[in-house]
Swiss-Prot record:
Subunit structure: Tetramer of two alpha and two beta chains.
Gene it is expressed from: trpA
GO MF annotation: an example: tryptophan synthase activity
Keywords: Amino-acid biosynthesis, Aromatic amino acid biosynthesis, Lyase, Tryptophan biosynthesis
Protein name as annotated: Tryptophan synthase alpha chain
Bilayer-crossing regions: none
Keyword Amino-acid biosynthesis: yes
Amino acid sequence: MSRIESTFSSLKTQGRKALIPYVTAGFPFADVTPELMHGMVAGGADVIELGMPFSDPSADGPVIQKAGEKALSFGIGLVQVLEMVRIFRTKDHTTPVVLMGYANPVERYDIKHGAGASESAFIRDAAAAGVDGMLIVDYPPEECVEFSARLKAHGMDLIFLLAPTSTDARMAQVAQVASGYVYYVSLKGVTGAGTLDVDAVEAMLPRIRRHVNVPVGVGFGIRDAATAKAIGKVADAVVIGSKIIQLIENQPRDRVAAVAHDFLKEIRSALD
């Protein structure tokens, strides 16, 4: 059982829902991320999604795009992201970390760091750093059988996005390769957009669960405790990203972790 599976299993036994915050690695300061991750765990995070900065993030809204641009300006690449996870793991051996990003940097890392025909350098190094899963936004499920198998061989899960526009055929494809959990994008468009229709989410989840036998997390548009509580009643996990980025972006360095901690504590309290 992977660390992600174990976390969801434990939460289910307790009758609780997973709280999954997203932050961009290296934002708002290049060296604050491990400390920020610890602060989020102390605030009630069960799994952390760590964004890998990329210059052309097509699925990200303006808030997360801007965070990625700032991280890139600090020189944050995949080598630095893995080092952040490694530092986090020196004190936290239990909280799952999922890397979220795009195929291009991963493929460039493999070329640069000597991937073989049957091995991915990035998967190998991510496993060594203590990563638990990956969500590669632009990897279609039908092309991920080998990638998923390589991740599983290193004890990691492959997370996929589903959307209101996902067909039953697409859900069936995702079900064949997904593990850990799936992330239901509750709005059409990019991250941080629009307002969330809880009734529409509730109507969609049974359809997803007919195909997918892993937990379902819901994100995009969750900005406060009331919305998180409503989503927590129907989903297995609540994912929050853009709101956290907005809260921390203008904080002094010594307040970043505390601000994220306090916000997540409020969300955790509403979920429980």
